[in-house]
From Swiss-Prot:
Cellular location(s): Nucleus
Quaternary organization: Associated with the spliceosome.
Function: Involved in pre-mRNA splicing and cell cycle control.
Organism domain of life: Eukaryota
Name of protein: Pre-mRNA-splicing factor RSE1
Length: 1288
């Protein structure tokens, strides 16, 4: 088979990893007005602002993602995110010329120095240096495991896990950061556990290191000094630690500044003026203060929990005050300890005190900011921003080094005392299991250590008011008059009448007028619009009324216009000055309003051959075009340009559609005119309209359902609105956004709401089109913009298909960086069940976020079990370690079922710690829940579900327990039995009266020792995933009632999950972060179906079984490295009304990814070319720079030819400033090598890499577009965008 005819996949990450393993604080970028004023000039600056700013920004990184947050306002505000196609192993910051820059090391084998900059309304990250360190890859001897930065920013120490250390000097000369050649300090046969940079002011930089001697396993404390005069790195002190439990080290501020004597005196004290560095070390159950000269070894016990295991320190940070300092340490139990070093009253020698402070989730890093906040980068689950409420100094809970042997037992708090949760970063890490619960909108339920999270691909619509209407409504409009930006009147069209509501003081009530000029009965309203300064236009089927609002808020009719006798008005559209009416005789009437509020009709009319189905005119003050759609499936563009009288009311372009248009909207978006078309066939079409010629181009389509598509237009929407800010804080939030110097948070965009079988929303962000479901419990028929004093941004009012008036707000517009709307399922407990509440969404209850109290979570072993019949229903099992019980709950669409015989919403199963579970039928109508415990017992329950009006109940009836004999890690139903792997056999269990009965035992090849994944296909085949022997295909012989191994793999794979894609194809993942597809060749499949027994008899039986355990071998179709451990796969037939089936997967570290089949040769070739261009971007741009820098005459002339990218991106190229090699990948990592970390990537296009094309500068896009078969930039962007729009 030709390679182009094989299966090709397009991979894109919908959510990146969420395990932030690295973090550092600093002031990385100036993006606010007061930042600019502080540095005295330009946004790009850095030369004038040499003084240090407050470090109120935090940079966090997973292994593949860098993100920047600002905490200046006491909340986490994301400024930047960027995918790095490499594995980040170390991250730190260094202050250079008043601003912080990033130091990044990873598997690229380089030390990368990166700088954030604010440009064009957005934050970008650029590479300053990529200094080679070692070979690529994560290696034991590569100096990439530990990063320590001198507090004065003079040098950086990089340490390998074993032996190697290198130090780089850093300096700023003429406003440019300079990095020296590396200085080495190698110690063979020593493993480095941790390093720390000591506080020595402007003395020679000193670093402390905790290391292990491989010869005898002893642990040592080493001090290394960089001699700035000799430019040499050397060890200056080493101390063997008698206690081998040392595991933590952190530097201590210069104690001399706080009146503490650091020089004990002695003949070998060295320079008396030198600062003596101290470090605090963590051991089992105690901490110790040590110094460079070995004079001090001050110990103090750590307050420990009652009956707890050993307590060790895992994280710590230092906070310097004006005349004091303290350190916060965290133990492996999550307890925080406050450590202070004070001078002794008599000798002024250091005295260490430690006291219990609070308990928070276990953190990777702790960071304290100058304005009284602390960020805890949690190891698992959510990360929190805390505010200090007080600095507790209770002496009764304090231990001191004066009595080093004294111990203290503490009772950890379950409610915070000294800290207050100010904000949180909702993270899903780890993902233990997942389940697809809905296809439209695409919804995934995931279980983590904390709770169940729902990920929904859509945009939130938050209900504020919902009220039933007396009759079935047809349409809705809002009107703001007399120049006010707040809407005053609300019109609802019914079948033969119109309802008029008045909006005032936060209430909506019916408008009562003594003399009502509006048509409210015996006619159907087609359009209500505000025109001119104080005019309201009402268009009904039988007339058009021009109404004026007076200053006393009364209304009077100024004009009534009637169509010819026997003719009715079908459609109407307007803007501030223009009005068009479509009549039933296929004529279009055009009006304009003058400055004196008079409405003037143009005598010439447009005549259309076919019946008009829709028409539209551009929003704003005046439109140059109007659009008319006819029943002949065409859309025609007519010119309304005053300066082009020859073509006035003439057709300038036309578009042929697949079916007649049911709705049209013309709106300006991002500097271009966009025509939105809804078709009778359920297809939505978006075309762009050329402002000069009126031609239609850049056509995008999306199938939304079987019903006709109606379109509602919403203008001036804030795509980045903070959903967690309430109405009172909304105005303050807008002012904060405006301070971002016109950044993306202050830009307003239009959007259209699409009404079909479900409600959708279409909008453009950063030149990409998004068509997403609008998330609401009710399907909306029409939507109109709604702005009031209470809802000042993104407000809208709508009528639902159930006949309700709904007033609410549209939430944050999701983009590629934030694809899902995330919410939490409130897990039922005894208190919740009584109140009956189910779905807890942080966005709906912001007060719960700000006043959240930290509690210790003792639940582990969480499983999501899908129901075989209902995709929306799933069972949730969680094990409580304290009670040694398993709790089972049922959820459907975010609502939990109540228990049949109690008020609880769960059922407890005592003495049960589950390892896996599944649903089986056993040939009966009733379903059975089978739970496998870690003790090797199969617990079988009958599931009984009762449904009544607004009341769903369930009960688990225990049948019996079956002893399996060993822990079972996977099982699945097979026909009317249960398939269970035991050792190197698979067993079919049937239902018995007292236990499950073994109906069949099939032995597998001897190489299979531990089966961890299992899946079956239509009761004929089973895929078995072994912990290290890849996947084996079993064929079920019904005559023998046995499973026959027919195919295995030629490569060892450490399987974590396996799933059938079709009868001959499986997809799987392994614990090294690889995803692969294996297929049984068709000729082998034919032989198996013809009869595998007869084929086996023809084979040469002389071949030993250990060489050929199975007669057939899998063929590798696809292979891809995702840098996360796949935990589950889901095959989705038509997600979000997509045009093809796809595969969704969830990774352990929070990754949610998507694999889309490329179905045409043209798609495959295009994305192959684009991916290759992006892979070669580093080389192409660097080569282009070298060629142009060698051409001196071209540089002097300042030529700016197409394809030249360097001078556009870096104006300083004129001064010979060179872009480092590998700058466009940031860290200099080859993308092909990264995706082929363990095995070569095969037939998978890296969509994440292709989408980086959208982030490039325009000149860079042009440069690379020439390498993609000379395609235009617009076509490349459209093809990339279409993969998300039409396929997911």
């Amino acid at each position: 088979m030709n390679e182009k005819e094989e299966l090709h996949l397009y991979h894109v990450s919908l959510q990146k990893q969420r395990n932030y393993v690295h973090s550092c604080i600093g002031h990385f970028v100036d993006y606010r007005h007061h930042h600019i004023r502080a540095q005295g000039g330009s946004v790009e600056g850095g030369k004038k602002g040499s003084k240090w700013r407050k470090q109120l920004q935090i940079c966090m990184a997973t292994q593949t993602q860098v993100e920047l947050y600002d905490v200046e306002e006491g909340r986490l505000r994301r400024l930047f995110t960027r995918t790095v196609f490499g594995t980040i192993t170390g991250l730190s910051s260094v202050v250079a010329d008043g601003r912080s820059v990033l130091i990044v090391v990873g598997d690229s084998g380089k030390m990368s120095v990166l700088r954030f900059k604010y440009e064009g309304g957005r934050v970008r990250l650029e590479a300053l240096f990529n200094e080679p360190l070692s070979r690529s890859g994560v290696r034991r001897l590569s100096p990439q495991a530990h990063v320590s930065v001198d507090p004065q920013g003079r040098c950086v120490l990089l340490s390998a896990m074993e032996r190697n250390k290198v130090c780089y000097l850093m300096d700023v000369k003429q406003g440019e950061l300079q990095v020296s050649s590396p200085l080495e300090a190698n110690r063979p046969n020593y493993v480095t556990m941790q390093t720390a940079a000591c506080d020595v002011a402007f003395d020679n930089p000193i670093f402390a290191s905790l290391e292990i001697d491989l010869a005898d396993g002893a642990k040592y404390l080493f001090f290394y000094m960089l001699d700035l005069g000799l430019n040499h790195m050397a060890k200056v002190a080493d101390f063997e630690l008698g206690d081998g439990s040392a595991n933590f080290i952190m530097s201590v501020p210069d104690l001399e500044q706080y009146g503490i004597n650091t020089k004990a005196g002695g003949p070998d004290d060295g320079d008396p003026d030198a600062i003596v560095p101290f470090v605090l070390m963590g051991f089992d159950n105690y901490v110790s203060l040590k110094d460079l000269r070995g004079r001090y070894d001050i110990n103090v016990q750590i307050p420990t929990r009652k009956l707890s295991q050993k307590t060790i320190i895992t994280a710590g940070t230092v906070q310097k005050l004006k005349r004091d300092f303290f350190m916060l340490l965290q133990s492996n139990h999550g307890d925080l300890y406050k450590v202070k070093i004070l001078p002794d009253e008599k000798t002024a020698s250091p005295v260490v005190t430690i006291s219990y402070f609070d308990t928070i989730p276990q953190a990777q890093n702790l960071h304290i900011f100058k304005h009284g906040y602390m960020f805890a980068n949690s190891e698992y689950g959510n990360s929190y921003l805390y505010q200090f409420e007080n600095l507790d100094d209770e002496e009764e809970s304090m231990l001191t080094s004066v009595m080093p042997g004294r111990r203290l037992i503490i009772e950890p708090r379950t409610v915070l005392k000294n800290l207050l949760v100010a904000d949180k970063l909702a993270l899903v890490n780890p993902i233990l299991s997942s389940q697809l619960t809905e296809r439209v909108p695409l919804t995934i339920a995931t279980s983590t250590l904390g709770d169940v999270r729902l990920f929904t691909a859509g945009v939130n619509f938050m209900d504020i008011i919902s009220s039933p209407l007396p009759a079935a409504p047809l349409d809705i409009w809002t009107v703001a008059t007399n120049g006010s930006r707040f809407h005053k009147l609300l019109f609802i069209a019914l079948q033969e009448s119109t309802m008029i509501l008045k909006i005032a003081a936060g209430t909506v009530e019916e408008l009562e007028l003594p003399h009502n000029p509006f048509v409210i009965a015996q006619d159907k309203t087609v359009l209500i619009a505000h025109m001119g300064g104080q005019s309201i236009i009402q268009v009904t089927e039988n007339k058009m009324v021009h109404i004026i609002e007076n200053r006393d808020e009364s209304y009077e009719s100024k004009l009534e216009w009637f169509p010819p006798a026997g003719i009715c008005i079908l459609k109407a559209s307007s803007n501030s000055t223009q009005l068009i009416l479509a009549l039933s005789n296929n004529e279009v009437v055009y009006f304009e309003i003058g400055s004196n509020e008079s409405l003037n009709e143009l005598q010439d009319r447009i005549e259309v051959e076919e019946r008009i189905t829709a028409l539209a005119i551009g929003n704003g003050n005046r439109s140059d075009y109007m659009i008319i759609a006819s029943v002949d499936s065409t859309v025609k563009v007519y010119s309304l340009k005053v300066q082009d009288q020859a073509n006035f009311l003439e057709v300038v372009s036309m578009q042929v559609l697949v079916s007649p248009a049911s709705s049209l909207q013309l709106a300006s978006s991002g500097g271009s005119l966009c025509l939105h078309i809804g078709l009778d066939s359920g297809v939505y079409v978006r075309s762009k309209l050329d402002r000069n010629t009126g031609e239609l181009f850049d056509v995008r389509t999306k199938y939304l359902g079987t019903k006709p598509v109606e379109i509602s237009l919403l203008l001036d929407m804030n795509p980045y609105i903070n959903e967690e800010v309430d109405d009172e804080g909304e105005e303050e939030e807008e002012q904060d956004d405006e301070e971002s110097l016109g950044g993306p948070h202050s830009r307003l965009v239009p959007c259209v709401v699409l009404h079909s079988g479900k409600t959708w929303i279409s909008y453009e962000l950063d030149s990409s089109l998004f068509i997403r479901p609008l998330l609401n419990d009710q399907s909306l028929k029409r939507v109109a913009q709604f702005t009031s004093n209470e809802i000042q941004r993104n407000g809208c009012c709508s009528i639902s298909s159930a006949g309700f008036l709904v007033i609410g707000r549209i939430g944050t517009f999701r983009n590629n960086d934030c694809w899902f709307q995330e919410s939490s399922l409130a897990l039922p407990d005894s208190e919740d069940s009584v109140n009956g509440n189910e779905l807890e969404n942080d966005e709906k209850d912001p007060d719960a976020l700000l006043e959240e109290k930290q509690k210790v979570n003792s639940s582990i072993g969480k499983l999501i079990i899908p129901d075989p019949d209902d995709i929306k229903l799933f069972y949730y099992c969680e094990y409580n370690e304290v009670e040694n019980s398993c709790r089972v709950s049922l959820f459907k669409q975010g609502i939990s079922y109540k228990h049949e015989n109690s008020t609880e919403a769960f059922q407890l199963i005592p003495d049960c710690r589950p390892s896996t579970a599944t649903i089986a039928r056993f040939g009966l109508d009733m379903k059975h829940l089978v739970i496998s415990t870690v003790n090797g017992v199969l617990k079988t329950f009958v599931i009984r579900i009762t449904k009544a009006a607004n009341n769903r109940r369930f009960e688990l009836l225990a049948l019996h327990d079956t002893v399996a004999g060993s822990t079972i890690h996977a099982m699945c139903p097979f026909h009317d039995k249960l398939l269970v792997p035991l050792a190197n056999a698979v067993v079919l269990y049937g239902l018995g009266k007292k236990q499950l009965l073994k109906k069949s035992i099939s032995y597998l090849p001897t190489s299979i020792t531990k089966i961890v994944a299992l899946d079956q296909w239509n009761g004929t085949r089973v895929a078995v995933g072994d912990i290290h022997e890849s996947v084996t295909l079993l064929h079920f012989d019904e005559r023998k009632n046995q499973f026959i191994p027919v195919a295995d793999d030629v490569t060892k794979r450490h399987v974590t999950v396996v799933k059938f894609v079709d009868e001959c194809t499986v997809i799987g993942g392994d614990r090294f972060g690889n995803i692969w597809l294996l297929r049984l060749p068709l000729e082998y499949d034919r032989l198996i179906k013809e009869g595998v027994d007869s084929y086996l008899l023809t084979l040469n039986t002389g071949i030993p079984s250990n060489i050929r355990e199975c007669v057939f071998k899998w063929q590798l179709l696809n292979h891809f490295y995702i840098n996360d451990i796949p935990m589950s796969f889901h095959l989705i037939a038509s997600p979000q009304m997509a045009d093809r089936a796809s595969i969704l997967y969830a990774g352990l570290q929070g990754t949610i990814g998507y694999l889309i089949p490329l179905i045409t040769r043209r798609e495959i070739e295009f994305f192959d070319l684009l991916e290759q261009a992006m892979r070669d971007a580093d080389h192409l741009f660097y080569l282009d720079q070298e060629n142009r820098l060698n051409d001196t005459s071209e540089l002097n002339d300042g030529a700016d030819e197409e394809g030249s990218v360097i001078d556009r991106r870096f104006p300083s190229v004129q001064k010979k400033r060179k872009i480092p090699e590998g700058a466009y990948s940031l860290v200099g990592r080859d993308a092909m090598m990264y995706r082929s970390y363990y095995n070569p990537v095969r037939h998978v296009t890296d969509g994440d890499l292709c989408e980086q094309f959208l982030e490039l500068y325009p000149s860079e896009k042009n440069f690379l577009a020439a390498r993609v078969d000379n395609r235009s930039v617009q076509e490349i962007e459209r093809r990339i965008n279409d993969m998300r729009t039409n396929c997911m």
